[in-house]
Curated annotation (Swiss-Prot):
It catalyses: acetaldehyde + NAD(+) + CoA = acetyl-CoA + NADH + H(+). Its EC number is 1.2.1.10. Coiled coil: none annotated. This is Acetaldehyde dehydrogenase 5. It comes from Dechloromonas aromatica (strain RCB). The lineage of its organism: Bacteria, Pseudomonadati, Pseudomonadota, Betaproteobacteria, Rhodocyclales. NAD(+) binds at residues 11-14, 161-169, 272.
């Protein structure tokens, strides 16, 4: 079966984990890995796995895009450089899946709103953050039953799983995730907090999701909705697990989740990597299926959507 050829930009934890996810895909093929440090472990790993590599950043990839028929690129660099990366690749007709918190394209959480993005051609979609991918499905599961005035999430992440790129973007991470709790999750006001946990051995990714409903919570319907949503996420992140809840205290609904990774690049505690890379892969697959079916055609654009 024909596959859509992909480039990965950023050779850190997220970019390297992505190679494994994309290699398993029936419709995606990883061809290029782009970095800026010739000595980086990610570039070495990519070469071992048969990818072409460049340490000259996106500019090192541009001359090869057309001859290698690259149609989808994943940006796992930093919010600070994403807009420029996206512009250069969009001009060549490459669709961008943004794994930074830059959020210049529409925000995407696969089980919540992926379908509406694939129906209209977007040349740049944003995956929000690992915390967003782990928690917004639950906020949405509650808000689709009844209105939510406030949604707050706390994500606890193992320090060893957080690379320099994510650390440099923590402010953007917080802002973009808070915004997405409102736009995608459906809460009128959203707040996101990230805790980087230095414990050794590293702890699994943990997420606490709290929502305040306008009316008294309809407990049976909320429980049913949350459990159904967890099953949807588990289709692409098998380690997504309910620890406790939904718990009800007046109008407050609280859900405790844990995310174990598949252990592709980093060990299983790094569920935050997995939920991000799996969501990005799932998103790219949906677009790839449409491209292969001929229902959408990528076109060069002057500026990202």
């Amino acid at each position: 079966m024909k596959k859509i050829r992909c480039a990965l930009i950023g050779s850190g934890n997220i970019g390297t984990d992505l190679i494994y996810k994309i290699q398993r895909s029936p419709v995606l093929e990883p061809v290029w890995m782009v970095g800026i440090d010739p000595e980086s472990e990610g570039l070495a790993r990519a070469r071992e796995m048969g990818l072409k590599t460049t340490a000259a950043g996106v500019d090192g990839l541009l001359p090869h895009v057309l001859e290698d028929n690259i149609q989808i690129a994943f940006d796992a660099t930093s919010a600070y450089v994403h807009a420029e990366n996206s512009r250069k690749l969009n001009e060549l007709g490459v669709m961008m899946i943004d794994l930074t918190p830059a959020a210049i394209g529409p925000l995407c959480v696969p089980p919540v709103n992926l379908k509406e993005h694939t129906e209209k051609l977007e040349m740049n979609v944003n995956m929000i953050s690992c915390a967003g991918q782990a928690t917004i499905p639950i906020v949405h599961a509650i808000s689709r039953i009844q209105s939510v005035s406030y949604g707050e999430i706390v994500a606890s992440l193992a320090s060893k799983s957080i690379g320099p790129g994510t650390r440099a973007n923590l402010d953007e991470f917080t802002y973009t995730t808070s915004n997405a709790i409102e736009i995608v999750g459906g809460a009128r006001k959203g707040k996101a907090l990230a805790i980087i946990n230095p414990a050794d051995p590293p702890m699994m990714m943990r997420n606490t999701i709290s929502c305040l409903t306008d009316e008294e919570p309809d407990e049976p319907r909320i429980i049913e909705s949350v459990l159904a949503m967890i099953k949807e996420v588990q289709k692409y992140v098998p380690g997504y697990r309910l620890v406790n809840g939904p718990l009800f205290d007046g109008k407050r609904v609280t859900v405790f989740m844990e995310v174990a990774g598949l252990g592709d690049y980093l060990p299983k505690y790094a569920g935050n990597l997995d939920i991000m890379t799996a969501a990005a892969t799932r998103t790219a697959e949906m677009f790839a299926e449409e491209i292969l079916a001929g229902t959408i055609q990528l076109k060069p654009v002057e500026m990202a959507v």
